[in-house]
Amino acid sequence: MIVFVRFNSSYGFPVEVDSDTSIFQLKEVVAKRQGVPADQLRVIFAGKELQNHLTVQNCDLEQQSIVHIVQRPQRKSHETNASGGDKPQSTPEGSIWEPRSLTRVDLSSHILPADSVGLAVILDTDSKSDSEAARGPEAKPTYHSFFVYCKGPCHKVQPGKLRVQCGTCRQATLTLAQGPSCWDDVLIPNRMSGECQSPDCPGTRAEFFFKCGAHPTSDKDTSVALNLITNNSRSIPCIACTDVRNPVLVFQCNHRHVICLDCFHLYCVTRLNDRQFVHDAQLGYSLPCVAGCPNSLIKELHHFRILGEEQYNRYQQYGAEECVLQMGGVLCPRPGCGAGLLPEQGQKKVTCEGGNGLGCGFVFCRDCKEAYHEGECDSMFEASGATSQAYRVDQRAAEQARWEEASKETIKKTTKPCPRCNVPIEKNGGCMHMKCPQPQCKLEWCWNCGCEWNRACMGDHWFDV
């Protein structure tokens, strides 16, 4: 396979590697090509420095992945905490916790909350993939943490890849001080920091971005993350068709209703045909949960890219028209025109201005939308609801399509009481080191043994699955 190496952030070149090629071997190839000592090279990928003993497969490097290699002398601080503080001291047995790459982070617990503590953002499937990756290429995990809309060449929802770059030099040479734990860490600027490894760059600000995971991408290829779309790890039936599909979209209502992407597409098109999208002053043109739950408008409007190019263009047009109407304007009623106009308040005679080739020149009545006339309007009809295509949801299906109900069942199966205060605590992946969230307790204990955390637990089964 081929990986692309960017050396000192200046230029890139391809390097042929195997899945079992070590990072040190990759350094040796680059060092020979560049005429520099291999021990001065540092390999940066997805927000962390890759250690010499790791292999290409262990690091989740895929065909035509881009890695950054910088020439920088080793420092004493690097020996203990080279990758941003995620690596603890060696255990008595010598086991070392490698800092977790962005390729293994899962933020769905932020959108799909549970009562977890500790490393709640790492799902059980992610922990399994750690051990599976070491067994060979045939065990490569199929679980996808992120989904994006790829505008090209895919033109559809695809698994995504989370990446990070330095906010100063805009190179992907920044190692994170700690990994993101929620979507806000990724989507809100200036929340996360690290250390840029590029020579002469003092940058510490992390900037996250996403790429389509279905095809090789260049440095500049980015895609928008769809944070409501997730793997249907709990096998929740779709609220509309009641089938168990994957992936699914989870609305941000209290019940976290689940809908498959095909039914979400139909829901959007139906509401679009009826012009029943909601115009929100802050969010824009959006839709609530299909069950009509309050306070559930979709905030990330790129989810409507699922409509496809033609319908999405119509969505944008209707959104712009709705904005004009909200401002007190009118739309030209002549077929094929529909220009947005802002006549004076109380002005009955409206002319679709023909300036700049935007208007058609049609003169119409503001009240009845017919050709302009003197006197009373002959007839006025309510446009809304005349041809409404009702999109109804079965109440029983709505009750079964709740992500939170499945979450409660999961919690029952995955919780253990704190050994000191008996408060139930859920383990949602990650290590065996638990901490009671109760302020009066805060006991650190071992999930495996059920006793207070000690050095024996640390050395014996800290990271057992």
From Swiss-Prot:
<keyword id="KW-0966">Cell projection</keyword>
<dbReference type="GO" id="GO:0051967">
    <property type="term" value="P:negative regulation of synaptic transmission, glutamatergic"/>
</dbReference>
<dbReference type="GO" id="GO:0000139">
    <property type="term" value="C:Golgi membrane"/>
</dbReference>
<feature type="cross-link" description="Glycyl lysine isopeptide (Lys-Gly) (interchain with G-Cter in ISG15)">
    <location>
        <position position="349"/>
    </location>
</feature>
<dbReference type="Pfam" id="PF22605">
    <property type="entry name" value="IBR_2"/>
</dbReference>
<feature type="active site">
    <location>
        <position position="431"/>
    </location>
</feature>
<dbReference type="GO" id="GO:0008013">
    <property type="term" value="F:beta-catenin binding"/>
</dbReference>
<dbReference type="GO" id="GO:0061734">
    <property type="term" value="P:type 2 mitophagy"/>
</dbReference>
<keyword id="KW-0479">Metal-binding</keyword>
<dbReference type="GO" id="GO:0000122">
    <property type="term" value="P:negative regulation of transcription by RNA polymerase II"/>
</dbReference>
<dbReference type="GO" id="GO:1901526">
    <property type="term" value="P:positive regulation of mitophagy"/>
</dbReference>
<dbReference type="InterPro" id="IPR047536">
    <property type="entry name" value="Rcat_RBR_parkin"/>
</dbReference>
<dbReference type="GO" id="GO:0042415">
    <property type="term" value="P:norepinephrine metabolic process"/>
</dbReference>
<feature type="modified residue" description="Phosphothreonine">
    <location>
        <position position="80"/>
    </location>
</feature>
<dbReference type="GO" id="GO:0045944">
    <property type="term" value="P:positive regulation of transcription by RNA polymerase II"/>
</dbReference>
<dbReference type="GO" id="GO:0032991">
    <property type="term" value="C:protein-containing complex"/>
</dbReference>
<dbReference type="GO" id="GO:0070936">
    <property type="term" value="P:protein K48-linked ubiquitination"/>
</dbReference>
<keyword id="KW-0805">Transcription regulation</keyword>
<feature type="binding site">
    <location>
        <position position="360"/>
    </location>
    <ligand>
        <name>Zn(2+) 3</name>
    </ligand>
</feature>
<dbReference type="GO" id="GO:0050821">
    <property type="term" value="P:protein stabilization"/>
</dbReference>
<protein>
    <recommendedName>
        <fullName>E3 ubiquitin-protein ligase parkin</fullName>
        <ecNumber>2.3.2.31</ecNumber>
    </recommendedName>
</protein>
<dbReference type="GO" id="GO:0003714">
    <property type="term" value="F:transcription corepressor activity"/>
</dbReference>
<feature type="region of interest" description="Disordered">
    <location>
        <begin position="71"/>
        <end position="96"/>
    </location>
</feature>
<dbReference type="GO" id="GO:0070842">
    <property type="term" value="P:aggresome assembly"/>
</dbReference>
<feature type="region of interest" description="TRIAD supradomain">
    <location>
        <begin position="234"/>
        <end position="465"/>
    </location>
</feature>
<dbReference type="GO" id="GO:0097237">
    <property type="term" value="P:cellular response to toxic substance"/>
</dbReference>
<dbReference type="GO" id="GO:0071287">
    <property type="term" value="P:cellular response to manganese ion"/>
</dbReference>
<feature type="binding site">
    <location>
        <position position="368"/>
    </location>
    <ligand>
        <name>Zn(2+) 4</name>
    </ligand>
</feature>
<dbReference type="GO" id="GO:0032436">
    <property type="term" value="P:positive regulation of proteasomal ubiquitin-dependent protein catabolic process"/>
</dbReference>
<dbReference type="InterPro" id="IPR044066">
    <property type="entry name" value="TRIAD_supradom"/>
</dbReference>
<dbReference type="GO" id="GO:0090201">
    <property type="term" value="P:negative regulation of release of cytochrome c from mitochondria"/>
</dbReference>
<dbReference type="GO" id="GO:1902254">
    <property type="term" value="P:negative regulation of intrinsic apoptotic signaling pathway by p53 class mediator"/>
</dbReference>
<keyword id="KW-0256">Endoplasmic reticulum</keyword>
<dbReference type="GO" id="GO:0043130">
    <property type="term" value="F:ubiquitin binding"/>
</dbReference>
<dbReference type="GO" id="GO:0031648">
    <property type="term" value="P:protein destabilization"/>
</dbReference>
<keyword id="KW-0770">Synapse</keyword>
<dbReference type="GO" id="GO:0042826">
    <property type="term" value="F:histone deacetylase binding"/>
</dbReference>
<dbReference type="GO" id="GO:0005794">
    <property type="term" value="C:Golgi apparatus"/>
</dbReference>
<feature type="binding site">
    <location>
        <position position="373"/>
    </location>
    <ligand>
        <name>Zn(2+) 4</name>
    </ligand>
</feature>
<feature type="modified residue" description="Phosphoserine; by PINK1">
    <location>
        <position position="65"/>
    </location>
</feature>
<dbReference type="GO" id="GO:0090090">
    <property type="term" value="P:negative regulation of canonical Wnt signaling pathway"/>
</dbReference>
<dbReference type="GO" id="GO:0140251">
    <property type="term" value="P:regulation protein catabolic process at presynapse"/>
</dbReference>
